[in-house]
Design a protein with these regions (language model features):
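Conserved, well-structured interaction surfaces
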Residues: 1-66, 92-97, 112-114
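Inward-facing hydrophobic residues that define packing positions of alpha-helical scaffold repeats
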Residues: 21-24, 100, 107, 114, ...
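Flexible helix-coil transition and linker loops at the boundaries of alpha-helical arrays
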Residues: 33-45, 113-146
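Structural signature of alpha-solenoid helical repeat junctions
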Residues: 40-47, 54, 77, 99, ...
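Structural register within alpha-helical repeat arrays
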Residues: 48, 55, 62, 150, ...
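Short coil/turn linking the two alpha-helices of tandem helical-hairpin repeats
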Residues: 63-70, 118, 163-169
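Short, flexible, mixed-charge acidic loops at enzyme active sites
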Residues: 69-82, 127
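Hydrophobic-face positions in mid-chain alpha helices that act as interaction patches
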Residues: 131-132, 140, 147-148, 162-165, ...
């Protein structure tokens, strides 16, 4: 880790993850503050759900790459769980448990927002891939299998719970349940 190339690579990964997180936070803030900007509540919920999911996806990678080993006896670290919308704002730092709770909350929010609003439940993949063959009000809702849809959130929950299960076995059953839903 003393090599300049390695340091630059690590810094680039860390910076890019937090750049994406801040962008997701901006979407969340805008969607929560400007409901009238969306054609309907379902669209707003899908976009919010995707933003919470992408934030959690990146934050989970931050934890895996830069956090402490779950259940390990290694160095204890605190990581910033960013909910800020500006690059110059400092995010609150959390220990492993606090960080994990924030991840769980974000994915639970994403799941709830997508569960009743994601068009993936009302159409087949074929219909969503050929928006001209069915009447879909907003073409943004097409190609849902290529986005962070409800099933992707369930898979991400399973991945997160499996990772957290190394520290606390109660998460293993939750990982199984989330994976079974997919």
């Amino acid at each position: 880790y003393d090599n300049d190339g390695a340091r630059q690579a690590v810094q680039a990964i860390y910076s890019k993850l937090y750049n994406i997180i801040v962008q997701a936070n901006l979407v969340i803030k805008h969607a929560e503050d400007n409901a009238a900007a969306f054609p309907d509540e379902a669209t707003r919920s899908v976009i919010l759900g995707e933003a919470y999911a992408i934030r959690a996806y990146c934050q989970l990678d931050v934890l895996r790459l830069f956090g402490e080993v779950p259940g390990g006896q290694g160095t204890k670290v605190s990581l910033p769980y960013s909910e800020v919308t500006a690059f110059d704002e400092r995010a609150t730092r959390y220990d492993f448990t606090g960080y994990s709770e924030k991840l769980i909350a974000d994915l639970d929010k994403a799941e709830k927002l997508l569960k009743d609003n994601d068009p993936i439940f009302g159409y087949t993949f074929e219909e969503l891939n050929a928006p001209s063959s069915v009447e879909i009000e907003d073409t943004y809702m097409c190609y849902r299998q290529s986005r962070l849809n409800y099933w992707a959130v369930k898979a991400l929950q399973s991945r997160m719970y499996l990772y957290l299960g190394k520290a606390d076995p109660k998460y293993l059953a939750m990982a199984y349940d989330a994976a079974k839903a997919v």
